């Protein structure tokens, strides 16, 4: 059990994540908490610092690469160094947005005004398409594969949209986007979960399926 007695900054936990070295991260209404099994470390907005959390309301936490995390707040995305224990970059996103990434750091963001990817050469997010997708519930309708592809399952359909880039780490003028749309399932897909090359999905009949993308 982990609560205020262990140093949790707020009892309303909005998200949790286990990083690549086994530490547990909790996003709350009052900052980010890191739990190593014995002690709690709390990170909040501190505007006396040059880089800080955009906001203390934490919506999601995910792996950015082998040394950083993505922390999504109410006012934007923060790149957080696990080694330095501090925010190293801020990216403004307003409204509803959803961050999806894999362990290699290939990162996409779905928003109401478009789809973005993180260009590691420029170290910023670049929009690659004006969105025609409803962003509602996209936190559970998309994932990034091990090779960096973005798989999106639009609501009320059995379709899949595949987005892929030739490179994440080159000048944006040299980046080529490929998009394909395919029928994936005979019934509407409601929820998905992806891990280690396999994803599970539940359709509108509440039947559960497992799919090996390899």
Residue ranges and their predicted role:
Residues 1-214:
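Carboxylate-rich, polar loop motifs that coordinate divalent cations or form catalytic acidic clusters
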